Design a protein with these regions (language model features):
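Conserved beta-strand signature within the Rossmann-like core of class I S-adenosyl-L-methionine
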Residues: 131-139, 324-330
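Short, glycine-/aromatic-enriched active-site segment of Class I SAM-dependent methyltransferases
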Residues: 136-159, 163-165
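Hydrophobic, well-ordered beta-alpha structural blocks that scaffold small-molecule cofactor pockets
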Residues: 26-27, 33, 52, 193, ...
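A short glycine-rich, Lys/Arg-flanked "PGG" loop and its adjoining helix->strand segment in the class I
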Residues: 118-133, 316
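Extended interfacial segments that mediate partner engagement and assembly in macromolecular machines
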Residues: 1-72, 149, 154, 159, ...
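Short amphipathic alpha-helix with an adjacent loop that forms part of the alpha/beta core around
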Residues: 88-100, 289-295
């Protein structure tokens, strides 16, 4: 699906760096790790998470198939598995380098991209030390629906998980969920802690019905109507609107709303790899944040809304000068 190239880098935003640091801190609070233990991060991206462990003397392995991220990942961990996850490839590294099985395995923000989630978890369980912990963080269905997060419905996301479905998958493959936390990452995520020792998974009350899905669709339509009405007003009144953050998930909204370069000319983006390219299906040119600020639009249309607090700090000068953020969801609003 990714053809060994992945656009997103974990270290681009301070919000995500802090979120990954929080996973490190949470792991330390469990007090089961010893210096020199092996840590494996599956879907390691640029190694932002593993860097925290490496600095404290743990042996770190990053599993990441995207070739464009390998150089940065190698700086932040001890060993790199440049392939899609499976136990066989990991075991080759363990044997070759005489490394113990991982005491901690993490899989952050990639559980919804799996073609075979059960096989993925089975291999992780096989790789995990008998006294180890597996931590997965992923967006949850309940918050996606509550927050009208249309962007989650994109080509990369093959699954949407309830707690019940997660518990089934982990238990089927010999892991029990002993702790679960919710946070605001990516609009709302579960952080799930599993091990082999517990007899049962904890219970979580979660209520998402078909009626909730129907209400979600209705709210999405209302957001769409309000948004398009406002963009039409901007065009009639010669107000310039740029996208802020040319995110993958944002393409779902752009295409569903039928927003193209006639309504929005440019998309401001921090990652240099995207500059000069165009948003898929909508044909909006992607430019750097620096270039976008020079053009000084009246409005920035925020795609990755989960980072809005960071964006407000970053664009303080522009906001004080009269700029406004457009938030398409959870509920359409103008922020100034």
């Amino acid at each position: 699906m990714y053809k060994r190239f992945y656009w997103y880098r974990s270290g681009v935003t301070n919000t995500m760096k802090q979120a990954l640091k929080d996973i490190y801190d949470s792991s330390m609070k469990l007090s089961f790790l010893k210096k020199g233990d092996t840590i494996l991060d599956i879907g390691a991206n640029d190694g932002t998470l593993l860097k925290y462990f490496k600095l404290k003397g743990y042996k770190t392995i990053g599993c990441e198939p995207a070739k464009n991220l390998t150089k940065e990942l190698k700086k932040n961990c001890d060993y790199v598995l440049s392939d899609f996850w499976n136990y066989k490839n990991l075991n080759n590294i363990l044997i070759k380098n005489k490394i113990d099985k991982p005491k901690l395995i993490t899989a952050i923000g990639m559980f919804y991209d799996l073609e075979d989630p059960s096989k993925f978890i089975s291999d992780a369980a096989q790789a995990l030390d008998k006294d180890g912990v597996f931590i997965a963080q992923l967006m949850c269905l309940e918050d996606m629906i509550k927050k009208n997060d249309l962007g989650n419905i994109c080509h990369e996301h093959l699954e949407f998980y309830s707690y019940k479905s997660l518990r089934y998958l982990f238990e089927k493959n010999g892991l029990k969920i002993f702790k679960i936390e919710k946070n605001n990452i990516n609009g709302g995520s579960y952080r799930v802690y599993c091990n082999k020792r517990n007899k049962y998974s904890i219970k979580v009350n979660e209520k998402t019905s078909l009626q909730d899905v129907r209400k979600f669709i209705s709210r999405v339509e209302k957001n769409k109507t309000k948004c398009l009405k406002f963009l039409d007003w901007c065009k009639k009144n010669n107000k310039e609107v740029f996208i802020y953050g040319a995110s993958t998930k944002g393409n779902t909204l752009l295409q569903y709303y039928n927003i193209n370069s006639e309504k929005i000319k440019f998309a401001s983006e921090r990652s240099p790899e995207k500059w000069g390219k165009y948003t898929i299906g909508s044909g909006i040119k992607i430019i750097s944040e620096k270039e976008a600020r020079k053009k000084n639009p009246d409005y920035f249309f925020v795609m990755p809304y989960g980072f809005i607090k960071e964006f407000i700090k970053r664009e303080k000068k522009w906001l004080k000068g009269g700029g406004n953020f457009i938030l398409p969801y959870p509920n359409f609003k103008i922020l100034n």
